[in-house]
Regions:
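Catalytic domains of carbohydrate-active enzymes, especially glycoside hydrolases
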Residues: 1
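Catalytic pocket-lining loop regions of alpha/beta-barrel enzymes
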Residues: 74-170
């Protein structure tokens, strides 16, 4: 079975999160962290809830990578994590790309269903012309995007569409 995860040994979520936290705690004035959620591979919502509660000041959001998890963001297995984000007022960053798991149109659906949460579409649908981003941003006030792997021409197009307040640079 294809797991969707990298072939290298994957560190369990809580173990990896603890390692990241130890680094962030050394430089709390310079770093915060996002917790990567992998609901297809790990069922640890209670443990994660306890961890966030204990270390909330260092945790800036949750992160999903649909392609490597081979799980669309619209999949109900993600929902317990969304409720956790709501509980702790955390944004949810989702890697988006032009593949069968990561399309920005899935963000449109989840932003509408969970309109009380804040979502960030990383890469504005990588490996595409990014144009769907404009429509999805306009339709969802709870959605932001970042500029990682996005060319300057598209950023200018976002500006022309009066969407600069919805961009995270980086």
């Amino acid at each position: 079975e294809v797991s969707g995860e990298h072939k290298n040994k994957i560190v369990p979520q809580i173990e990896g999160t603890k390692k990241a936290l130890s680094f962030v705690k050394k430089y709390p004035d310079r770093f915060g962290m996002l917790i990567r959620c992998r609901p297809r591979f790990e069922k640890n919502i209670q443990e994660l809830d306890t961890f966030i509660s204990k270390h909330r000041e260092f945790i800036y959001g949750l992160k999903f990578h649909p392609y490597t998890s081979q799980l669309k963001i619209t999949d109900p297995r993600n929902y317990p994590y969304f409720y956790l984000a709501k509980k702790y007022n955390l944004p949810i960053l989702v890697h988006t790309a032009n593949d069968k798991y990561s399309k920005l149109i899935y963000m449109d659906r989840v932003c509408k269903k969970f309109n009380d949460l804040t979502f960030i579409a990383a890469h504005c649908e990588l490996l595409s012309d990014h144009l769907i981003t404009i429509e999805v941003l306009k339709n969802n006030p709870n959605l932001y995007c970042d500029t990682a792997w996005v060319d300057m021409k598209f950023i200018k197009l976002l500006k022309a569409n009066d969407l600069m307040d919805r961009i995270m640079f980086g």
